[in-house]
């Protein structure tokens, strides 16, 4: 909701989960192969391939599967279904990493949410090296939370009574490309970026107070302000 892009640079953000889900099904197979199938394609590889040589958006799943079966004499078959539109800025990649980590590693015993999050962030780094971990965190724990890269998350218990409407333009954008553009701006305009970061940081603190006071109209106005900073 607040602090996107700035969160990569250690600024606090406010995150909110939505009612769209990713479903990942994982099954053990006798054949020692990793097979991944989704609406965006298919990937079938032997275990222990070099991650850096895999040119596929499905490689986070391969990373997780390969890690899970490294001491096992078996393979994995993974099926992915997503309700989240791709390239719409709704964290579909992170949600996939979280669902993938949970589905795959639960085949081999109990796993905590903390461990699922750790594995999901590792997997996401195969496609977004400088991930903040924000989207993986809210996908793991759900609800409304404040988050920063250095201190982790804190659930916001005073959830305001309002509904968010998300409009999808159906114009896909690359997260990697947008993150690179922000980094380029930060490198060339240090002073301006620091000024914007300070403004965003204050905005987030103001919004946290408004949430506690359940001031919906004012929160909406802050959303517009957040968009201007972006």
What feature does the model see in each segment?
Residues 55, 90-98, 131, 194:
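Short, conserved micro-motifs enriched in small and acidic residues
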Residues 63-87, 119-122:
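Glycine- and acidic-rich phosphate- and metal-coordinating loops
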Residues 20, 90-113:
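DPxDG-like acidic metal-binding loop motif
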Residues 20-22, 74:
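A generic structural signal for short beta-strands and their flanking turns/coil linkers
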Residues 7, 15, 23-66, 106-110, ...:
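C-terminal nucleotide
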Residues 5, 40, 82-84:
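Short, histidine-centered active-site or binding-site loop motifs used for metal coordination
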